[in-house]
Amino acid sequence: MATTQQSGFTPAASPLASTIVQTPDDAIVAGFTSIPSQGDNMPAYHARPKQSDGQLPVVIVVQEIFGVHEHIRDICRRLALEGYLAIAPELYFREGDPNDFADIPTLLSGLVAKVPDSQVLADLDHVASWASRNGGDVHRLMITGFCWGWTYHLAVCRA
């Protein structure tokens, strides 16, 4: 299903296509949650199938530089339709909101560069712990990343 909404993208991401694909959610449960991490409550978006037998394989979806916007949330929904528990944590939540930045250079210097690698990696560990407490099988844990998130997907795979 296509919609004309461009919700959740930072102004720095312009121009955007006039339509986006949105996965139907009648067979999944999706929404926002809060994950305890390093003394804070990290916002995250998650999606899972409505019906499942036992624990689900887990996919951590690491955001791009524009944060957890509608496209990243839709990736979680697509993964849920395939039988996964998918989680996209808001990894910038301590430093700021990407929607507050009008261009990419300012977004990079004003937000992205301020997020320490050690903080991101620790947050991702807490996402995995949350998944194990919420129906996920962390022995079948995968991670994918987009743009900025690709770096962290590689770092986690190397650890």
Stretch-by-stretch model annotation:
Residues 1-159:
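N-terminal cap/leader regions of alpha/beta-hydrolase-fold enzymes
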